[in-house]
Design a protein with these regions (language model features):
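N-terminal secretory signal peptides
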Residues: 1-10, 18-29
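Non-catalytic, solvent-exposed segments at the cell envelope interface
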Residues: 15-16, 34-314
C-alpha cells in the first residue's frame, strides 16, 4: 500500500488535540481569529460536562442523488472524565424519521436537507431528531464529514497503519463517478492512504455492516495511535489540509472548548458498541432489504452504554 508523505511541524500534543476533537477542533481553528482572549478563557471544557453528537459520513457528490449517511455513530464526549463512548448505527436500520415516516436511517439526513433545498442545518436537525425519537438520546450537535474529507485527514497524518484481521475483497466497490471497482486488502499489518482508508471503512459486500463497523473502529484507534507516536502535526497544518472536510452545527465556543480539552483524551478512554445483538435481517413493505430492530431493548442498551452503566460489545 502506498504511504503519503508525513506532514511534520509542532508537538504530539497538538496532533492529539486535532484528532480527538476531530471536526470540532478543525472548525474552531479555521475560524481562530474571531476568538478573543476572553472568549478562549470563557471556553471552559468542564463547564460543558457531556455532549452527545451524531457523527456521520455523508455522500455530498450531487444534489440529484440522495445525500445518504454511509457511516453513523452516536458519540458521547465526557469533558470532565476525558472519555468518548460511541455506538455504531447500521445504515440499513429501519426507523421512524419524524415528519417523513419510516425508512432506513441512512435516509434521514437527506430527507431533512432536501426538504429545505439541500440545507445542512435542516439535514442535521432531521438526523438528530431521528436519533432522539428512536433511541431516546438528545443530540447536541451533528458532525458530518464528506468522503473526500475523511481521506484528507488520513493523508494529513501521512496515512494510517492498521492490522487487518482477514483478507477483504470487494468486486463492486462504488466509485465517485457512480461506477464500481475492485478493492483488496490483505490480512495483517498494512499502511493505508486516505483513499484506501476510506475504501477500507466503507466496503461491506464481503462481511456486511458488522465488518464495516469493525474496520471503522480499527482505523479510528490506529489514527489516534499514529498521532501519539508521530513527530506531530500542528493544528494549523491539519486545518490547511482539511478545509471544507467537515460540516457541523456545533457552536464555535463549544468547538473551542472541545479543542482545549482534547489533549486529555487517550485511546484507553475511547469505547465502542454495536447493535449486533438487537438487530436482524428483514424486508420492508416496499421490498427493500433492511435491519429490523428489537425496539424493546435498543433504547435502554444505547442509553446504558453511553452513560457507562452497560459495557460495550465492540
Amino acid at each position: 500500500m502506498k504511504q503519503s508523505t508525513i506532514l511534520r511541524s509542532a508537538s504530539r500534543r497538538t496532533a492529539l488535540k486535532a484528532l480527538i476533537a476531530a471536526p470540532a477542533a478543525l472548525s474552531a481553528v479555521s475560524a481562530w481569529r474571531p476568538f478573543s482572549a476572553g472568549a478562549q478563557e470563557a471556553a471552559d471544557p468542564a463547564s460543558l460536562g457531556t455532549l452527545n453528537f451524531i457523527v456521520g459520513g455523508i455522500d455530498f457528490r450531487s444534489y440529484d442523488e440522495p445525500e445518504n449517511s454511509d457511516v453513523l455513530m452516536i458519540a458521547r464526549v465526557d469533558l470532565i472524565n476525558s472519555t468518548v463512548r460511541a455506538v455504531a448505527i447500521p445504515r440499513d436500520l429501519w426507523v421512524t424519521i419524524p415528519n417523513f415516516g419510516e425508512d432506513k436511517i441512512t435516509r434521514a439526513y437527506d430527507y431533512g436537507s432536501k426538504a429545505a433545498g439541500s440545507d445542512f442545518k435542516s439535514g442535521a436537525e432531521a438526523i438528530s431528531e431521528t436519533i432522539t425519537y428512536n433511541f431516546g438520546v438528545d443530540i447536541h450537535a451533528a458532525i458530518m464529514t464528506t468522503f473526500d474529507g475523511f481521506a484528507q485527514i488520513v493523508n494529513a497524518f501521512g496515512g494510517v497503519n492498521v492490522n487487518n484481521p482477514y483478507d477483504i475483497y470487494d468486486a463492486e466497490y462504488p466509485t465517485a463517478d457512480y461506477g464500481i471497482k475492485e478493492v483488496y486488502f490483505p490480512a495483517g499489518d498494512i499502511t493505508l492512504s486516505g483513499e484506501e482508508a476510506l475504501e477500507f471503512c466503507r466496503t461491506r459486500h464481503q462481511d456486511g455492516d458488522d465488518g464495516r463497523s469493525m474496520r471503522q473502529r480499527i482505523v479510528l484507534r490506529s489514527l489516534l495511535d499514529t498521532a501519539r507516536q508521530s513527530d506531530g502535526l500542528s493544528l494549523q497544518d491539519l486545518v490547511n489540509a482539511n478545509r471544507g472536510a467537515y460540516r457541523t452545527n456545533l457552536g464555535r465556543s463549544k468547538q473551542l472548548a472541545l479543542a482545549l480539552a482534547a489533549p486529555d483524551f487517550t485511546n484507553d478512554g475511547v469505547s465502542f458498541a454495536t447493535l449486533q445483538n438487537y438487530i436482524y435481517p428483514s424486508t420492508a413493505s416496499n421490498g427493500a432489504w433492511i435491519y429490523a430492530g428489537d425496539w424493546s431493548q435498543i433504547p435502554g442498551y444505547v442509553q446504558g452504554f453511553l452513560d457507562g452503566s452497560i459495557d460495550g460489545n465492540a
